[in-house]
Amino acid sequence: KDLIKSLPFKLTDSQNKVLSEIFSDLTNPNQVMNRLLQGDVGSGKTIIAILSCYLAHLNNSLSVLIAPTEILAQQHYQNFEKILVSLNVPLFLLTGSKKIDLKKIPKNAIIISTHAIIYQKAHLDNKISLLIIDEQHKFGVKQRSFLNSSTKLPHCLTMTATPIPRTISLTILGN
């Protein structure tokens, strides 16, 4: 709540409702979240992702946001950094050109990545508690199936600005 109060803008009623639902899912030990967050470009999906990852951080859990391109991953990283910089949240960027040693990541970190993390996922298997996928339909079939191959399924939030039937069916059916 302190982070929300410190934001330089007020969340909309819709954002507050979505956050309440996501926070309820993330704190319910009897359920694994699998949600689709659809909104136009600029509608505030990123702040929902930031606040959701921050809740995971506060609960000493690892969260990962995966973006389809390096440019989008860098934009997300910069947005997360702006909001979280004063809170000493361990924040990492992993792309094809920016490597990190996943074995040394604190368990309460936030990782922003491209599909590059998929190929190093073995180091994180069963450690990710929240997985946020931005524009899932832009990932290939092999990449999506690899993301879902953990023995312990994390909470999953899929964000999209493209309400196409394929995205909706992928989220509902999980394949």
What label would you give each PLM region?
Residues K1-V64:
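Pre-Walker A segment
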Residues R35, L65, F92, I110-I111, ...:
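Hydrophobic positions in the central parallel beta-sheet of the AAA+
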Residues G39, T114-H115, D134-E135:
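Walker B catalytic acidic pair
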Residues A56-V64, L84-S86, L153-H155:
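Post-Walker A helix-loop "phosphate-sensing" segment adjacent to the P-loop in P-loop NTPases
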Residues L62-L72:
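Conserved RecA-like ASCE P-loop NTPase motor core of nucleic-acid helicases/translocases
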Residues L72-K99:
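Conserved helix-turn-beta segment of the N-terminal RecA-like "Helicase ATP-binding" lobe
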Residues Q74, D125-L130, Q136-N175:
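Post-DEXD/H (motif II) to motif III coupling segment of the RecA-like Helicase ATP-binding lobe
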Residues L94-I111, I118-I128:
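Conserved motor-coupling elements within RecA-like helicase/translocase cores
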